[in-house]
Amino acid sequence: MTTPIEKTDAEWKALLAEKGAEPAAFEVTRHAATERPFTGKYEAHWDDGTYHCICCGAKLFESSTKFDAGCGWPSFSQEAVPGAIRNIVDRSHGMVRTENVCANCGAHLGHVFPDGPTETGLRYCMNSASLDFKKK
């Protein structure tokens, strides 16, 4: 997968450490790990602002599109900027899902499901470890 921003694992680790990212951020964003449900700092976070990629700072979601899906991960109904998120078919764990990655740096963000409660019908189910929040 080629993206505009390419770095080695060592460079990503250093960048995330410099940003003060939580310990799980490297494994989540660079190796598609998933944080445990109801443990992420943004799961029950309702401040007004924007959510960005922890790795490169790309704007991903507006807080106005966040909703409580009851799944244990921050959930959004649509991306903030069309094309900011790239979809990849994920066949891991014996199922087929749609993985979301940052279109700018390839960071694993989470998955999108067609069961959202809003007019988009989508539920972007994200890992808090892949996000950085900027308050309005």
Curated annotation (Swiss-Prot):
<dbReference type="GO" id="GO:0008270">
    <property type="term" value="F:zinc ion binding"/>
</dbReference>
<feature type="binding site">
    <location>
        <position position="105"/>
    </location>
    <ligand>
        <name>Zn(2+)</name>
    </ligand>
</feature>
<keyword id="KW-0479">Metal-binding</keyword>
<comment type="similarity">
    <text>Belongs to the MsrB Met sulfoxide reductase family.</text>
</comment>
<dbReference type="InterPro" id="IPR002579">
    <property type="entry name" value="Met_Sox_Rdtase_MsrB_dom"/>
</dbReference>
<feature type="binding site">
    <location>
        <position position="56"/>
    </location>
    <ligand>
        <name>Zn(2+)</name>
    </ligand>
</feature>
<feature type="binding site">
    <location>
        <position position="102"/>
    </location>
    <ligand>
        <name>Zn(2+)</name>
    </ligand>
</feature>
<keyword id="KW-0862">Zinc</keyword>
<feature type="active site" description="Nucleophile">
    <location>
        <position position="125"/>
    </location>
</feature>
<feature type="domain" description="MsrB">
    <location>
        <begin position="9"/>
        <end position="136"/>
    </location>
</feature>
<feature type="binding site">
    <location>
        <position position="53"/>
    </location>
    <ligand>
        <name>Zn(2+)</name>
    </ligand>
</feature>
<dbReference type="GO" id="GO:0030091">
    <property type="term" value="P:protein repair"/>
</dbReference>
<dbReference type="InterPro" id="IPR028427">
    <property type="entry name" value="Met_Sox_Rdtase_MsrB"/>
</dbReference>
<keyword id="KW-0560">Oxidoreductase</keyword>
<dbReference type="Pfam" id="PF01641">
    <property type="entry name" value="SelR"/>
</dbReference>
<dbReference type="GO" id="GO:0006979">
    <property type="term" value="P:response to oxidative stress"/>
</dbReference>
<dbReference type="GO" id="GO:0033743">
    <property type="term" value="F:peptide-methionine (R)-S-oxide reductase activity"/>
</dbReference>
<dbReference type="GO" id="GO:0005737">
    <property type="term" value="C:cytoplasm"/>
</dbReference>
<protein>
    <recommendedName>
        <fullName>Peptide methionine sulfoxide reductase MsrB</fullName>
        <ecNumber>1.8.4.12</ecNumber>
    </recommendedName>
</protein>
<dbReference type="InterPro" id="IPR011057">
    <property type="entry name" value="Mss4-like_sf"/>
</dbReference>
